[in-house]
Amino acid sequence: MSLDKKTAFITTPIYYVNSSPHIGSALTTVTCDIITRYWKRLGKPTLFLTGTDENATKVIEAATRAGEDPKRFVDGLAAEFQRTWRLLHIEYDDFIRTTEPRHIAAVHEVFNRLRSSGDVVKGLYEGWYCVADETFFRDSDVAEDHCCPNPECGKPLRRIQEESWFFRLSAYADRLKQYILDHPNFLQPEFRRNEVLAFIDQGLRDMSITRSSTGWGIQVPDEPDKVIYVWFDALVNYLVGAGWPDHPERFAEIWPADIHLMGKEIFVRFHATLWPAMLMALGMELPDIIYAHGWWTIGGEKGGKSKGNLPHPGDLAARIAELSGADYEISVDALRYLLIREMQFGLDAEYSETAFLQRFNSDLANDLGNLLNRSVSMAGRYLNGMVPPPQPAPDGYDHLLNNAVTEAGDALGAIQMNTAMEAAFRLVSRCNKYIDERQPWRQAREGDDQAVRETLYTCFETLRVVAMMVQPVMPVAAQRIISSIGLDLNPAEVPWQSVGKWGQCPEKPLPSPIPLFPRIPANLLNRTTENIQESQTTNMSDMPEPSTQPLPAVSVAPFPSNSTITIEDFAKLELRVADVIDCKPVPNTSKLLHLRVKLGEEERDILSGIAETYTADELIGKQVIIIANLQPRKMRGIESQGMILAADMNGQAIILVPETRVPSGSPVR
């Protein structure tokens, strides 16, 4: 961050409004939101700018296809982008549209200043032109088929000759190259920086920055037959968002931008060369960091609007909610996490709905959700539903927490979102392992109440720290975790620097445990949709709410008449409620779990073939219903002393549990 300004300033690119948002644009915008939330936790005033690019020829083409007036068309899509970002818990400060008067006036000011300084000059252009991309190409860039070299376009090029205004980009090549070499963090990641240097070494040509008017776009001052090239126009939005030219005092507090974030396709030619050269010509400071992230790919090829193969983020969040049973707000947070966790920032990543759902189960349901549920459940069982008084940290554990907080903060500051979350979830894994090592159920059974307090206090402190660490990524889920462990505070208001300090969980009563991230059943996990969004070109107001309908009933064959039993037969079964106090997989089998259950004062071992539905960890702390008087049976060298009751849903075992917690050993009538 520049030391002589007060406000941290981050931007997304402004998005073309030729179709609806998808998870590609969501990745960029969510990342900026995460960084902004982190900056706020550091105590920095912030400005987060996003918006829409509405002056391109593509917009007219899309409006024509939709049978709409261009202005009405862009108004509708701009509103949809805003609704989508609000849905994703994105808290931008300013949403700029390039059809706004403030933007048009600033573009005219830039053009006039550069024309007056001799950096914009009139000339004759002759060469290849792509109407769809509004881009001129060198002869060396064009293949023999004379089609657009942009792989997303590929349309036939036109050979044209027309009078145009040119920005003297070539005049800034040496200065720009030297600036990049002198400021190694200016362009990121490093391999993209090298691409820019190679591009400059090929020779920067003066850029045509006007086009013949089609009746849409920003008119060239005093020349109604020409409009300003959409990229020259669009980049100016960053200055406008910072207050230029009408609010110089505000602009001085905000500019230069700390981070421009965008996809790699608009990095080399526009953000990393044209834009810095424009700023140099205007005599303005350059941004601190210009960062290009990778693409979501499908089968190794870029997914996106033109192919319609990336889902709308609202649809994907609804899908997660439908399959998992999590509420919609939590599912949105889960999507935010999955977007940044599935991609190593800067590189491409293959989009797979199945991979997203599998990570939901592994990270959020099995790890974080399970840690929260088992910690609160065991406190309810062993500590009368209370967070214990603060206890000393296990040897080295407080340093472990502090180091993780520091690592995550450093990663967020370096725009490495996945690394930050890896640091948080290592704590989750360590704490789950800590529970297994300490075995609080055994400590309670042996009457070592102090050991139980120490163990569970460590769990609650870990959950507090993890919630604070994931808050920039999952703000709603973080608040739920904090409330679930008895804390009455807003994680967004807790300074990042204070998070790792041990002993901040006071003795307090706990609410009843409610699963935060319910696990997606195995039989639903692979039931992915091929075309998840039907609203790729419709308004979000038309998008249905997440389904609240129950799952369809399972088809069951009629019972034969000779399968009935008498009430006396049923009375022979002794059904009781048991507490699961320990659970582990049975070696060399994929289906069996070895459960240790408590029936009043008695403990038993039971083997159950439910491992394809449940992990061992998520069963600890649950109550189950067992047949208590079943003749013991030895399996895999272990004597099983009962049977757990479970429903069969399409071959998947779903355990039966009491609606509310009851004393262990209670009879089932």
Give the residues covered by each predicted segment:
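A glycine-rich helix N-cap at a beta->alpha junction
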Residues: 77-93
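Helix-rich, typically C-terminal accessory recognition domains appended to large enzymatic cores
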Residues: 122, 128, 347-350, 355-392, ...
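N-terminal catalytic cores of NTP/NDP-binding nucleotidyl/phosphoryl-transfer enzymes
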Residues: 2-77, 96-112, 116-117, 133, ...
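Cys/His-rich short segments
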Residues: 117-173, 177
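Structured secondary-structure scaffolds
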Residues: 2-50, 102-106, 152, 160-381, ...
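Phosphate-backbone binding interfaces of nucleic-acid-interacting proteins
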Residues: 542-669
